Amino acid sequence: MKTLLKAACVASVALVPSVAAAACDEGEVVIKFSHVTNTDKHPKGIAATLLEQRVNDEMNGKACMEVFANSTLYNDDKVLEAMLQGDVQLAAPSLSKFETFTKQFRLFDLPFMFKDIDAVDGFQNSETGQAMKDSMQKRGLQGLAFWHNGMKQMSASKPLLSPEDANGLKFRVQPSDVLVAQMEAIGGSPQKMAFSEVYGALQQGVVDGQENTWSNIFGKKFFEVQDGITETNHGILDYLVVASVDWLDGLDADVRDQLLTILAEVTETRNAEAFAANEQAKANIEAAGGVIRQLDAEQRQAWVDAMKPVWAKFEGDVGADNIAAAQKFNESGS
């Protein structure tokens, strides 16, 4: 194992010599964490930075973590294959990025699956949630922790108060068949597009609207080039911290156990703070002059009725049992 670790160190130094040489001591397990967001404003970036700090403080001499933010090492479309090749040890792609490994995570893209973030939390921390994290083991990946961004809202170049308002509009979506079907269900034209391209596309009218969390809408200033944001809370944008099965199995038990304990503690802390971060982002949008529209119960139900038929199209991929398990956490007191 020491030979493999030395090789990992050499590879890391070759990629970013100044960072690797300064950060890691010889003999430490090098843990490269690749993600696509900034480090200080985005819930995922903040969580990754906290994890890095704690691992390097508490596991000094045993392990060394290096975080590569803003796609400086890999983007989310390439990082999982790089992980299977041993070139990166941890990543946290959005759940739609696991399409080629499992269809079960399509559950989280189904519109109005969860009533709020507490229901999401309950499901992800349940036995079914753990089984979903384990569902890619045969493909060489192990899910370790769900990280929240938050609930998704809708925005466009015109007010969106009813599903009919979306008819004929072009909406940016992540590369997810579920999200494509969701937009088609309300008469929209879904356009798959990288996150980094969205602001310019909205500004230039390449697309008319998008769906995202408050933190993303504020952080990327989408509200500046939209008529307003409608608070729909129709979906969840989350990430899965993942590692390769081979790498995890190759760690000494004490290193693996301590790493997973720290990860669990960081996850609990940052997931709780992600909700507050989104609420602050929402307030910041309003303070900056952005328009936020609320739906009354009747209006919201119209969106539910328009989008919910999407569930039937993907029940075979997601699993009826998983859908039923998720719905239990929408019930009061679950």
Predicted regions: what they are:
Residues 1-30, 333-334:
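Short, low-complexity disordered leader/linker segments with a strong preference
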Residues 23-119, 127-130, 136-334:
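N-terminal secretory/targeting leader peptides
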